[in-house]
Design a protein with these regions (language model features):
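Phosphate-binding site of ATP-dependent enzymes
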Residues: 144, 151-154, 165-219
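Flexible, charged surface loops at secondary-structure boundaries
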Residues: 1, 74-78, 150-152, 188
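Rossmann-like NAD(P)H-binding beta-loop-alpha module
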Residues: 132-154
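Redox-cofactor binding/interface segments in oxidoreductases and associated redox assembly factors
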Residues: 7, 83-84, 197
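Extended, domain-scale alpha-helical bundle/helix-rich regions
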Residues: 9-11
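Conserved N-proximal alpha/beta basic substrate-recognition cap immediately N-terminal to
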Residues: 3, 13-139
Length: 219
């Protein structure tokens, strides 16, 4: 029997076909002759303790992919692999999906990444466990603390804790009224923590994404 893989993603209209790693993974699955299915998080459901998904099969990739393909219900245990590739924000819908995936994992489905790990670890907060490898960092909702952090570093980056893909990231090199207004908005009037980091000038030289699997570099 041909192996099946499920990719839980954003809508195809919102995927960047030039850089989204989910697209690269799907292409690799095609090369390995794995039957590929796709869904969004709202397609997951529970029926008598079984976690199923209303998903579509994908036979090829293109930016104008036909999303009107008839969907079918499949138990997550019937997939060789289930990849949770939905991007933030980590909102109520996202967390509800993780709860369902955790139940599916308990029932024997193979889920990547582990739903418990996704629930437990915010990737931006998790990075603070390794301070020697990241810029000077402040996580706070206090405008006074953020202002003091700016005074110490003169140039800082501010961004939400649940963002991704470069959205809502601001470089602050002057604590003028416009930037204070941005900070007030991002912190929801000092009710929501944001992450602030000292600005690294070398960012203009580009960066590298390093993937490590079982302690080995993935080339």
């Amino acid at each position: 029997m041909t192996e099946k893989a499920l990719f839980i993603t954003d809508t195809f209209e919102n995927l960047n076909f030039k850089k989204d790693t989910s697209i690269l993974m799907i292409e690799e699955a095609f090369k390995k002759e794995i039957n590929v299915f796709q869904c969004e998080i709202n397609d997951l459901f529970v029926d008598n303790n079984d976690v199923l998904v209303n998903c579509r099969e994908i036979n090829s990739l293109s930016e104008d992919i036909d999303t009107e393909v008839t969907k079918i219900d499949i138990d997550l245990k019937d997939f060789k692999y289930c990849f949770m590739r939905k991007d933030p924000p980590v909102d109520e819908d996202y967390n509800n999906a993780l709860h369902l995936l955790d139940l599916a994992k308990h029932n024997g489905a193979v889920i990547h990444n582990n739903p418990c790990a996704l629930k437990k670890f915010n990737e931006k907060v998790f990075a603070t466990h390794f301070p020697e490898f990241i810029p000077k960092t402040l996580i706070s909702s206090s405008i006074n603390k953020i202002s003091a952090f700016f005074d110490s570093h003169k140039k800082i980056i501010i961004k939400p804790l649940d963002g991704m893909g470069g959205t809502s990231i601001y470089k602050v090199d002057d604590l003028n009224e416009d930037n204070l207004k941005i900070i007030r908005t991002m912190t929801n009037s000092e009710k929501t923590q944001i992450i602030c980091q000292s600005f690294i000038e070398d960012v203009y030289e580009g960066d590298f994404r390093i993937l490590i699997i079982n302690g080995c570099l993935l080339y």
